[in-house]
Regions:
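Local sequence-structure signature of Cys/Sec-based thiol-disulfide redox active-site neighborhoods
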Residues: 53-68
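Short glycine/proline- and charge-enriched loop/turn segments
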Residues: 92-94
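The canonical Cys-X-X-Cys-His
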Residues: 67-77, 133
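Short cysteine/histidine-rich zinc-coordinating motifs and their immediately flanking basic loops
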Residues: 82-89
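Post-cleavage N-terminal segment of exported redox proteins
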Residues: 2-54, 97-147
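Residue-level detector of alpha-helical recognition elements and their boundaries
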Residues: 66-68, 85, 128
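Short alpha-helix boundary/capping elements
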Residues: 60, 74-81, 138-142
Length: 147
């Protein structure tokens, strides 16, 4: 029994370290996107939670007349599981505090931004939008069921 408790403590510790690493990766992505945004616009002052939250919840009218937002699939709380509006497939939380795999791979993050921004907005998101989006997602650490 004592060995099981030690194993559980070790596993919980690894999960915490993994979540911290994912948050650190997200922060690195924010720095990369902020640098890109400043290169494109020297007057850019940096990402904000307010801009990220607005971008995340902003409804955009699609060609079929329906409105979509990031929150349409990812829910209003990025720490919650989402559900794809078309396939109904469960989407793991965006918040790296809850989902240690989120923001772990820069190429995957960039590919998802390109795919989803093009599908919804009609073009890739700007580096400033990406930086603010991730900044906002980092603030949501608690799933709704636990609030």
């Amino acid at each position: 029994m004592k060995q099981l408790n030690i194993l559980l403590v070790a596993l919980l510790g690894l999960t915490a370290v993994s979540a911290q690493a994912s948050v650190a990766n997200a922060e690195k992505l924010i720095m990369i996107y902020t640098t890109q945004a400043k290169a494109a616009n020297p007057e850019y002052t940096g990402p904000t939670v307010a801009d990220g939250k607005f971008f995340f919840n902003r409804k955009i009218k699609l060609g079929n007349g329906k409105e979509m937002a990031c929150a349409s699939c990812h829910t209003a709380n990025p720490a919650d599981n989402g559900k794809h509006v078309a396939t109904r497939k469960v989407i793991q939380p965006l918040s790296p505090a809850v989902n240690a795999k989120r923001f772990a791979d820069f190429e995957k993050v960039e590919a998802k931004f390109t795919q989803h921004c093009t599908d919804i907005i009609g073009s890739d998101c700007t580096p400033a939008e990406k930086a603010s989006y991730i900044t906002y997602v980092l603030t949501e650490k608690t799933p709704s069921a636990k609030k």
